[in-house]
UniProtKB/Swiss-Prot annotation:
Biological process according to GO: regulation of mitochondrion organization; signal peptide processing
Disruption phenotype: Impairs mitochondrial integrity.
InterPro entries documented for this protein: Peptidase_S54_rhomboid_dom, Rhomboid-like_sf, Rhomboid_protease_S54
Enzyme Commission number: 3.4.21.105
UniProt transit peptide range: 1-73
Entry annotation: catalytic residues: 256 (nucleophile), 313
Keywords of this entry: Hydrolase, Membrane, Mitochondrion, Mitochondrion inner membrane, Protease, Serine protease, Transit peptide, Transmembrane, Transmembrane helix
GO molecular function terms attached to this record: serine-type endopeptidase activity
Protein name in the entry: Rhomboid protein 1, mitochondrial
Intracellular or extracellular location(s): Mitochondrion inner membrane
Main localization, broad class: mitochondrion
Purpose of the protein: Mitochondrial rhomboid serine protease processing the mitochondrial membrane fusion regulator MGM1, and the cytochrome c peroxidase (CCP1). Required for TIM11 stability, ATP synthase complex assembly, mitochondrial morphology, cytochrome c (CYC1) storage and mitochondrial genome maintenance.
Length: 346
């Protein structure tokens, strides 16, 4: 099966910010520091113009006991409003980071959880799509499964636009590398996008490759491929900082781990399919484009350029190739059985 697929494969950014329990982002994106709630004002008896100072102070802060947080917000709010072009800003201090880091990283338990989920998804998907609604609907409409995954990603992106949801999203939809806030983030981060360009590129890649691959593999196999590639990307993303001995790492998010898995499986099964990068055809077909992406991601891990999560890309790519190899072997065995069965009649 060959065809022309347009791809603008989005990347999974490894953000350089750390969200912690004792700091928060207000709806106006101002900085809130962890400072004592109140502090009494000190009055010097011999201070000049004491009455004027007290009067001016009361105009600004009408209470005797005032919060230093309110002063910080009033002074620094204009600066932070000008400089915060992203969804979040750098918040925590290095001391807080060290305290969180010293608390330990459940990397082993996350790995066991990830492998268990991958096994459960692989063996449970056939039953799920055979007997459990609404998954049974996707068995006969595999393309709609792709649209459903696309819709979930868009919905989570919409939640990122609501400041009231940030605390929930920071806990469950960001994959923290040094201090895991929730084990659900190993999957949740794969459905999370904070910027429109990131969402748009990933969803275009999902639509380009996913609709064709879901029709060929079936809903159950495609769902297993997508979810396990996402989990593999998260596991690689967690292990890479430890193996590379990186001192400071930020959280990551995005569906690119799963999408590189889809690309890997597609290119393995259809190596000569034509690929368009934006509007330009890639020479050599899908397999050449995939190998180029692997080389680029490997170089990114080694040279550590940019802020993308190259390890997650590699993890998803390896899972996609593994699925492609397994499916090709299964198809070949079925073909041999059919030939043997047909030979008995002649």
């Amino acid at each position: 099966m060959s065809g022309v697929s347009s791809v603008m494969l989005g990347l999974r950014p490894a953000t350089r910010i750390f969200f912690r329990s004792n700091i928060s982002v207000s709806p106006s994106r101002t900085f809130v520091s962890y400072i004592g709630r109140s502090q009494s004002t000190s009055i010097l008896k011999n201070a000049p113009n004491l009455e004027d100072n007290v009067t001016n102070l009361q105009k600004i802060i009408p209470k005797r006991f005032f919060s230093q947080t309110s002063i910080l917000k009033s002074r620094w709010k204009p600066i932070f409003n000008e400089e915060t072009t992203n969804r979040y800003v750098r918040l925590n201090r290095f001391q807080q980071y060290q305290q969180q880091r010293s608390g330990g990283n459940p990397l082993g338990s996350m790995t066991i959880l990830g492998l268990s989920l991958m096994a459960g998804i692989y063996f449970g998907s056939p039953y799920l799509f055979e007997h459990v609604p609404p998954f049974t609907y996707f068995k006969t409409h595999p393309k709609n499964l792709v649209y459903a995954l696309l819709g979930i990603n868009v919905a989570v992106f919409g939640l990122w636009q609501l400041p009231k949801c940030w605390r929930f999203l920071q806990k469950y939809m960001l994959l923290q590398k040094d201090y895991v806030t929730s084990k659900i983030s190993i999957i949740g981060s794969a459905f999370s996008h904070q910027e429109f360009w990131h969402l748009g590129m990933n969803m275009l890649a999902l639509w380009s490759f996913g609709t064709s691959l879901a029709t060929m593999l079936g809903a159950s196999n495609f769902f297993s491929l997508y979810m396990n590639s996402a989990i593999a990307g998260s596991l690689f993303s967690l292990w890479y900082p430890k193996l590379a001995r990186l001192a400071i790492v930020g959280p990551s998010l995005g569906a690119s781990g799963a999408l590189f898995g889809v690309l890997g499986c597609f290119s393995y099964l259809f190596p000569h399919a034509k690929i368009l990068l934006f509007v330009f055809p890639v020479p050599g077909g899908a397999w050449v484009a995939f190998l180029a992406s692997v080389a680029w991601n490997a170089a990114g891990c080694a040279l550590r350029w940019g802020s993308f999560d190259y390890a997650a890309h590699l993890g998803g790519s390896m899972m996609g190739v593994l699925y492609g190899w397994y499916i090709s072997k299964a198809v070949e065995k079925q073909r041999q059985r059919r030939l043997q069965a047909a030979g008995r009649w002649f």
